[in-house]
């Protein structure tokens, strides 16, 4: 049975609450031990120690303590941690898997509540004589449960009322006046340390992640790590690795693109709803709505992904296009990023799966997740996903092209080209952030060769240089220098600064001839453009919002508008031009900007004429249905009935036989409006009889021979 621990600090409140800055208070709220390491009180505050009341102490304090309790409530809320479910792990070292923040010396101590009234405890000074030790059986048994269930159950925390402390001389620590180890009770020795219970390999994983990125030292992320370890304990992947390792690698990918603690924590927990005992409510209680909503969003995307894979939706171009558009429109884009990170690590370890599954996952990734990464603008993830899929879908071509790429690479030529450009920039007084060599991704080369019917020698941008400068003006000045140093290939200059790509990519591209025979592509961009190119929608995480053209919230709104706008315009152009693919159709406004008078502008708060897409499950088969705006369940049912040649034995249309469920829940109002991304299940409805009566009737028909007659009359079952 889960029992929350009651905890108190071993130092007087002055050592904890008299901090002179908000940063010190924040440090205290993150779980640092306030006892021996507390700074000496300032002269202004050392003589004003007051009793701090809160939590359960409000039940027992004098009337004068009530105002103090209310005033201290906000401060105390950050200092007390919910430790429900920990008693087994802390008390007996069992496999309960409880969590607490890892600390060198925990400030939490256990009270002897069984043998002493809480009233004198809450009012006694910190230096009062120690009371008798708890019995060995105190932490187990019905007495403990009865005690806690009577008045402590679900308590958020508790505190001690301290008696005023006399002023201390300047420079003398409060710990001198009050014994740091003296409590109103003695401490069970084995309870003094409240360390998380987890496997040794898990601690190694956490240490490794912390060495790779500092965000894994964050309190929220550490808490998410231990909860993920508890949720996935004992689970392994097909490769034999612990499941927790996949969670950590997913979170590391997110950390590398600059994700904050909320997103990284959700990355650690992204599979808990689908693959463990945890549900949304538990995550919400432990981490709040921010993390819980993201984990739930990833779970929904995973569900749709599985449906698409099982029904081979990726092979149907129209439905695949609708599906990944729906992914972007229906979910927080951060949930899509987490799902992409999850898929990227899965693809990196795909060798552990059987060959058939490798092919299926690679095909789905290429058709669904690569376009997602492209539209979000995360070039590095897109390239990695494409190359892995290319290796498994076209192994022979991949091997041949890899060999040719290695042969064509000339390191000496690249080095001399870099040196020449560096000297030219310095001579003209152009500073830059970075200058490096690059090469086109393997799949991009292959795709270009197939699309334009070229040989590898005809692809001019396989190798190149990338220059990152300070300002947009520097981009064009550097371009002039490049064209003075080398002859350029006619028709190969592209100005993506004036004409950005659909996903927001901006840069200058030109192709030059080195030593007269070797084509090199040169990319020139600013630092902000480089972040946008590498991290796309996540680029705002890489620099302060104050330096952005669009704030984070505005970008989220514009993202949702752009996705729906793009789809509305693309489908309109598709109908008029007969194009089979809509990727090449340009939206009316470039992302993330949007003109106010655009006829296709969309927000979730206003009416719009754009279509919605819903997942329809009928007889375990999935399809992605396009419906007009404001469509209802009845509209979908009528479409199903109209498109089906079958009728029921009672001559009702097929839709009358079906009982719809929306997002796995029965609906009472068939006129309910459908939303983007809804999952509608159409299941046959049994007659209004009990199942027993239904079986008995079938048995009687069989015994009378009527079953054969009915079968002959109605024809064989389809």
From Swiss-Prot:
GO cellular component: chloroplast
SUPFAM superfamilies: HD-domain/PDEase-like (SSF109604), Nucleotidyltransferase (SSF81301)
EC number(s) from the headed UniProt entry: 2.7.6.5
Family membership noted in the UniProt record: Belongs to the RelA/SpoT family.
Native source species: Oryza sativa subsp. japonica (Rice)
Annotated region described as Disordered, given as residue ranges: 9-48
Keyword Transit peptide part of the UniProt annotation: yes
GO molecular function, one term: ATP binding
Protein name: Probable GTP diphosphokinase RSH2, chloroplastic
An annotated GO BP: guanosine tetraphosphate metabolic process
Gene: RSH2
Domain HD residue range list: 243-347
């Amino acid at each position: 049975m889960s029992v929350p621990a009651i905890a108190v600090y071993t130092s007087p409140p002055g050592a904890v609450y008299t901090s002179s800055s908000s940063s010190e208070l924040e440090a205290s709220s993150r779980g640092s031990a306030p006892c021996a390491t507390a700074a000496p009180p300032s002269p202004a505050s050392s003589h004003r120690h007051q009793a701090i009341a809160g939590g359960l102490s409000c039940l027992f304090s004098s009337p004068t303590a009530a105002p103090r309790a209310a005033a201290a409530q906000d401060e105390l809320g950050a200092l007390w941690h919910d430790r429900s479910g920990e008693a087994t792990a802390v008390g007996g070292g069992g496999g309960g898997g409880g969590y607490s923040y890892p600390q060198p010396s925990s400030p939490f101590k256990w009270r002897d509540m069984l043998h002493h009234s809480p009233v004198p405890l809450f009012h006694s000074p910190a230096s009062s004589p120690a009371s008798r030790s708890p019995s060995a059986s105190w932490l187990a048994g019905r007495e403990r449960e009865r005690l806690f269930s009577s008045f402590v159950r679900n308590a958020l925390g508790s505190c001690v009322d301290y008696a005023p402390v006399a002023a201390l001389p300047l420079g003398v620590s409060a710990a001198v006046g009050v014994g740091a180890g003296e409590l109103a009770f003695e401490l069970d020795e084995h309870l003094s340390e409240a360390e998380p219970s987890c496997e040794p390999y898990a601690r190694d994983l956490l240490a490794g992640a912390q060495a790779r990125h500092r965000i894994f030292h964050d309190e929220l992320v550490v808490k998410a790590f231990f909860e993920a370890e508890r949720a996935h304990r004992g689970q392994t992947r097909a490769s034999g690795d612990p499941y927790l390792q996949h969670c950590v690698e997913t979170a590391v990918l997110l950390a590398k693109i600059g994700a904050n603690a909320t997103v990284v924590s959700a990355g650690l927990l992204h599979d808990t709803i689908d693959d463990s005992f945890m549900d949304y409510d538990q995550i919400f209680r432990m981490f709040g709505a921010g993390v819980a909503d993201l984990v739930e969003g990833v779970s929904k995307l995973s569900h749709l992904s599985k449906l698409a894979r099982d029904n081979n939706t990726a092979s149907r171009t129209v439905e695949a296009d609708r599906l990944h558009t729906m992914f972007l429109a229906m979910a927080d884009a951060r949930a899509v990023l987490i799902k992409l990170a999850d898929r990227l690590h899965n693809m990196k370890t795909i060798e552990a799966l059987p060959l058939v599954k490798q092919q299926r996952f690679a095909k789905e990734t290429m058709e669904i997740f690569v376009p997602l990464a492209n539209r979000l603008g995360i070039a590095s993830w897109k390239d990695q996903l494409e190359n892995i899929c290319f290796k498994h879908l076209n192994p022979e071509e991949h091997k041949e092209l890899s060999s040719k790429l290695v042969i064509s690479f000339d390191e000496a030529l690249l080095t001399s080209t870099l040196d020449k450009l560096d000297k030219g920039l310095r001579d003209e007084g152009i500073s830059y952030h970075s200058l490096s060599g690059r090469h086109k991704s393997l799949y991009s080369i292959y795709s270009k060769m197939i699309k334009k019917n070229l040989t590898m020698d005809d692809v001019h941008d396989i190798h190149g240089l990338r220059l990152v400068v300070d300002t947009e003006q520097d981009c064009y000045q550097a371009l002039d220098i490049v064209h003075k140093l080398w002859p350029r290939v006619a028709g190969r200059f592209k100005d993506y600064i004036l004409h950005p790509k659909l996903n927001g990519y901006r840069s200058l591209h030109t192709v030059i001839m080195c030593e007269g025979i070797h084509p090199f592509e040169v990319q020139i961009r600013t630092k902000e453009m480089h972040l946008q190119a590498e991290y796309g929608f996540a680029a705002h995480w890489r620099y302060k919002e104050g330096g952005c053209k669009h704030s984070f919230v505005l970008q989220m709104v514009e993202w949702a508008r752009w996705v729906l706008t793009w789809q509305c315009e693309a489908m309109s152009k598709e109908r008029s031009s007969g194009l089979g693919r809509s990727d090449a159709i340009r939206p009316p406004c470039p992302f993330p900007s949007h003109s106010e008078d655009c006829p296709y502008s969309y927000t979730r708060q206003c009416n719009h004429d754009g279509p919605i897409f819903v997942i329809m499950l009928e007889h375990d088969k999935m399809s992605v249905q396009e419906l007009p705006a404001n469509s209802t369940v009845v509209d979908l049912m009528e479409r199903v009935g109209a498109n089906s040649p079958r009728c029921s034995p009672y001559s009702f249309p097929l839709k009358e036989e079906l009982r719809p469920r929306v997002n796995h829940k029965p609906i009472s109002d068939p006129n309910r409006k459908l939303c983007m991304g809804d999952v509608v299940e159409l299941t046959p409805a049994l007659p209004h009889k009990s199942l027993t009566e239904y079986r008995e009737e079938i048995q009687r028909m069989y015994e009378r021979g009527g079953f054969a007659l009915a079968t002959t009359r109605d024809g064989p079952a389809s």
